[in-house]
Amino acid sequence: MGKVSPKDLDSKTSVRKKKLKSSSNKYLKPGALVQLCYSKASAAKSCNELGKKRVPVFDTKSCNDLGKKRVPVFDIKHARNNKMAVEQLNSPKSPLMLSPVNVVKRSTLVRPMKFDDLQVESNNTCKKSPLMLSPMGIVMQNTLLRTPKTPQADPCVSESQLESLPMDLLVKIVCHLHHDQLKAVFHVSQRIRMATILARQYHFNYTTPDRSRQEMLRVMTPVPINRWPFRRGDGNPTMVSSPHTPKAPKHAPRPPSRTKLAEMKQITAVLFQDQTPFPSRCIVPSVLQRPTLFKPMAPKHPRVLFYEDELCQAVAQNNLT
C-alpha cells in the first residue's frame, strides 16, 4: 500500500465538504426565507443610490419643496419582486408562516384575549377567508374556540339593613332560628356567616330542632307563601296530623298440637313402670325461695347499711345463712 500525500487528503476533505455544502444548500434553514425577503424589501426602501434601477419611494412634500421634476425609471421585473416581498411580509396569509419556528413565535406572542377582543377579531378574520389556511389561522382558531373567562364582579360593599346591625344583635337573631333555617342563612353573606359561627360556638342553647316542627316538615313541604305555623291564604291555621304507622300484620294462628297430654301420661306410665316418671333431681319446685343473707332484724334496726365490725360479729355468731 502506497502512502497518501497530504495534498490528496486535503483535496478529498475539500471535496467532501463541498458535497456536504451542496447537499445542505438544497434545504433552507427555518426563517432563512423570511430574512432574505426582509433584506430585499429593506434594501429596496432604503436605496437612494444613483445609476441603479430601483423603485423610488415618493415623498410629495420633498418634491414640492425642491421644485424639481423627478422622473423615476421603472424596472418592471424588479418592481414585481419587491412588491411581492412587501405583500408577503405585511399580509398574515403568507406562505412564510409555514416555517415551524415562525408558528411557534407567533403562537407565543398570542396574548390571552378578552371576550370583546374575540368578537372583533372573529369579525376581522371572517372577512379574510384565506387566513384560516395558514398555521397562524389555526392558532387563532384555537384561541377563538377557547371558552372566555367569566367576568368577575366587584365585591359588593353595600350592606343591607340586617347586615348593618351590630354583631351581638345578629347573634341573638340567629339564635332564634331553627336548624333547617340555619343551613340557608349560613350562605347569605360573610357577616351573617360570622354571626352563625359565633352563635353555634358560644350562644346556641341547643333547644332546636323543634321535634313537632321537624315531623311536620317531613310530612308537608311548605309553600313559599306559608310561614310557621303553616297557614293557608285565608288565614285559617291548619295543623296537619302526622300519619300513623300502619299496624304490622298479625301472625297466623298456630295449628293445634297433635299430641295430647293425657295420652302422653299413659304412654310414659307403660314405658317407665319401675321408675318414677321424673327423677327427683329433675323436679323443680314451682316457687323458688330467694335466699336471705340476713335474718329479719328487729324493728328497732331499720338500717340497711352496716359497719364492718357489725358484719364481723354477725359472721362470728353464724347469723348469716
From Swiss-Prot:
Q: Which organism is it from?
A: Arabidopsis thaliana
Which GO terms of the cellular component aspect does the record hold?
cytoplasm; nucleus
Top-level taxon in the UniProt lineage: Eukaryota
- For bias kind Basic and acidic residues, which ranges apply? 1-13
PANTHER family per the UniProt record, alphabetical: F-BOX DOMAIN CONTAINING PROTEIN, EXPRESSED, F-BOX PROTEIN SKIP27
Q: Where is this region: Disordered?
A: 1-23, 228-258
**Membrane-traversing stretches:** none
Output this protein's name: F-box protein At4g35930
Q: Where is the F-box domain?
A: 159-207
Secretion signal span: none
Looking up InterPro entries in the UniProt record yields: F-box_dom, FBS1-like
Q: What is the lineage of its organism?
A: Eukaryota, Viridiplantae, Streptophyta, Embryophyta, Tracheophyta
